[in-house]
């Protein structure tokens, strides 16, 4: 910091005196009320919104891991961190995971300008979908999200998020399906699944549970007098009137399953979500990928300050008529 005398002066430091010590910054981060920092960030977002720089038409929500300042096999030095898992890929056919001790920085980003609208830091064991509704509600207090287009990865593929975007904010959700717990059933063109013996199964009514409707399919020979199953299924000789295997298919009767994810409109709109990845990359470049503090309060405040800095760069660039509102290097040069 000693190299940037003008910047220090703008920040209120006396360049003729020594800078505050490490422990002074450490105490500041530990005692600072995060609500005050959130108010500063909200004021910046409002200012940029009034200037037409940020917009809530296309918003993306994503999280990025923040490693705690502790050993991976002994996290006792930071009692507030938690064990989290980070997926190295969004492809459903790739299972590359990384476990870590630390936190998550959840950021709602304007996918047009690439600037943050709201942020929330949680321990690493909190699921992304668990805090989505809270983040949207908080961001809506600063900038209206009515009629927004919400973009997120498959980690947010939860029915409640779709319903919140649709009913509360009157928007549209562009989220790929998460194939968790699903089976790739072989089916005919008519939609009837094929059993293990290669025979088309018959419809056998519908069932409703857990807020979903499922179509039941049964064995075509369930009431047959034959003593042998074509594939020797374990349920054939069950001693019951109806024999053989059964399968279920979820009937797309809700908003989540009614979205056509194969159309060109969905693919082009969802491509805007890459702005979230770009912002997370800029966030990590500020040194937040691994913390130097060792408590939850300091971690939360440090992350919020990093997002405030990104918005400050944008504000300074816009007020000075520059288009480089994403570059911290350009801001330092202008200072």
Regions found by a protein language model. Give the residues of each.
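Short, charged, surface-exposed secondary-structure boundary motifs
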Residues: 130, 181-190
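Polybasic low-complexity intrinsically disordered regions
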Residues: 25-167, 174-178, 303
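Major-groove recognition helix of helix-turn-helix-like DNA-binding domains
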Residues: 2, 12-32
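Blade-loop segments of beta-propeller domains
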Residues: 7-11
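Long, low-complexity, polar/charged, intrinsically disordered or flexibly structured peripheral segments
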Residues: 218-258
């Amino acid at each position: 910091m000693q190299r940037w005398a003008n910047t220090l002066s703008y920040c209120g430091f006396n360049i003729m005196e020594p800078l505050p010590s490490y422990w002074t910054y450490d105490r500041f981060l530990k005692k600072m009320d995060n609500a005050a920092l959130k108010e500063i960030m909200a004021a910046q977002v409002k200012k940029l919104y009034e200037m037409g720089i940020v917009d809530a038409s296309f918003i993306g929500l994503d999280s990025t891991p923040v490693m705690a300042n502790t050993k991976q096999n002994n996290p006792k030095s930071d009692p507030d961190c938690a064990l989290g898992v980070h997926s190295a890929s969004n492809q459903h056919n790739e299972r590359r995971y990384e476990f870590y001790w630390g936190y998550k920085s959840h950021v709602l980003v304007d996918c047009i300008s690439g600037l943050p609208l709201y942020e929330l830091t949680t321990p690493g064991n909190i699921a992304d979908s668990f805090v989505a509704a809270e983040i949207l509600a908080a961001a809506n207090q600063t900038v209206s999200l009515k009629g927004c287009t919400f973009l997120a990865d498959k980690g947010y593929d939860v029915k409640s998020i779709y319903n919140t975007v649709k009913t509360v904010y009157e928007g549209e959700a562009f989220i790929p399906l998460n194939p968790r717990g699903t089976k790739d059933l072989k089916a005919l063109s008519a939609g009837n699944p094929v059993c293990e013996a290669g025979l088309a199964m018959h419809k056998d009514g519908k069932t409703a549970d857990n807020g979903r409707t499922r179509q039941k399919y049964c064995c075509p020979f369930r009431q047959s007098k034959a003593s042998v199953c074509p594939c020797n299924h374990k349920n054939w000789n069950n001693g019951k009137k109806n024999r053989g295997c059964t399968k279920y298919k979820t009937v797309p009767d809700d908003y989540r399953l009614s979205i056509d994810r194969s159309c060109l409109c969905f693919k082009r709109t969802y491509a805007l979500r890459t702005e979230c990845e770009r912002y997370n990359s800029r966030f990590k470049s500020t040194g937040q990928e691994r913390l130097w503090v060792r408590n939850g309060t300091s971690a939360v405040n440090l992350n919020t300050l990093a997002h405030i800095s990104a918005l400050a760069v944008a504000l300074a660039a816009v007020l000075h008529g520059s288009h480089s509102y994403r570059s911290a290097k350009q801001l330092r040069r202008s200072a």
